[in-house]
Amino acid sequence: MTLEEVRGQDTVPESTARMQGAGKALHELLLSAQRQGCLTAGVYESAKVLNVDPDNVTFCVLAADEEDEGDIALQIHFTLIQAFCCENDIDIVRVGDVQRLAAIVGADDEGGAPGDLHCILISNPNEDTWKDPALEKLSLFCEESRSFNDWVPSITLPE
């Protein structure tokens, strides 16, 4: 038995519980950030915020469905945003369900259709450091993931 096999056996239940906890924390963080008015949605809007005030951004969520995986322009944007977030010490995660994200964040258009939710930034609501328990859980999750060389961990949102 190799070290990877031993490590894989031990961490499967822990990994699943860790992932579920991160998904629940992300759900709570999105709702809290939306209530506080510190949520920016959209690839271009997020890029503007990152360019103008990266020190105020605390967390980044990249979301893409399976059909979005073939969108080369979107993948290039994701790569640039990921690089910018890593360079500026902004925690970042990926979500594979844009519709679930839309159900949490809500619709932006007058027609009720969700706006561009491929990138969501969460900023500090004021000058003081924002102390949100869900944000702290996600920061720890991202830190642990980086220790396993998973720089942009994927999270599954709860139903």
Swiss-Prot record:
InterPro entries: GADD45, Ribosomal_eL30-like_sf, Ribosomal_eL8/eL30/eS12/Gad45. Keywords: Apoptosis, Developmental protein, Differentiation. Residues 43-86 are annotated as: Homodimerization. Disulfide bonds: none annotated. One of its GO terms (molecular function) is identical protein binding. Pfam families: Ribosomal_L7Ae (PF01248). Signal peptide: none annotated. The keyword Lipid biosynthesis does not apply. Transmembrane segments: none annotated. GO terms for biological process: apoptotic process; cell differentiation; positive regulation of apoptotic process; positive regulation of cold-induced thermogenesis; positive regulation of JNK cascade; positive regulation of MAPK cascade; positive regulation of p38MAPK cascade; regulation of cell cycle. It comes from the Eukaryota. One of its GO terms (cellular component) is cytoplasm. Gene3D superfamilies: 3.30.1330.30. Two central helices mediate homodimerization through parallel packing. Belongs to the GADD45 family. Undergoes concentration-dependent homodimerization, which is required for growth inhibititory activity and enhances interaction with PCNA. Interacts with GADD45GIP1. Interacts with PCNA. Involved in the regulation of growth and apoptosis. Mediates activation of stress-responsive MTK1/MEKK4 MAPKKK. This is Growth arrest and DNA damage-inducible protein GADD45 gamma. It comes from Rattus norvegicus. The lineage of its organism: Eukaryota, Metazoa, Chordata, Craniata, Vertebrata.
